[in-house]
Amino acid sequence: MRIRLTAGTTNLLTMDLLMELSDAIADAQNRSRGLLLCGGDKFFSNGVDLDWALSQSSEQIRAMFLELGKCILQLMECPLPVIGSIKGHAIGGALALLLACDYRFGAKGRVLI
């Protein structure tokens, strides 16, 4: 099963995206024999939406990072082979998601990690 992170033109990690990712990982474990995690067309992800984070309470920020941690653990503990497909940069939490994959494959060229 392929899971593609798509969140606008900057592909930022948001609470909604992370909750959808968590659900998709759980669904993949029940319906497929492998998992491919992909980012956007130009880059994997710009990481956490800092503008959002600056406008939130510490409780909301903590909840979002707990959700990110949940996704990371799901990827690490997934019984399926998990592959991270990297095109372009992967910043912050996005890099953590890729590091939780069993295998990572990147496109040729220079990238920012």
Walk through the language-model features, giving the residues of each:
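Conserved CoA-thioester-binding segment of acyl-CoA-metabolizing enzymes
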Residues: M1-C38, L73, E77
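Glycine-centered loop/turn positions within well-structured domains
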Residues: N11, K42, V111
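Glycine-rich beta-to-alpha active-site loop
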Residues: I72-I113
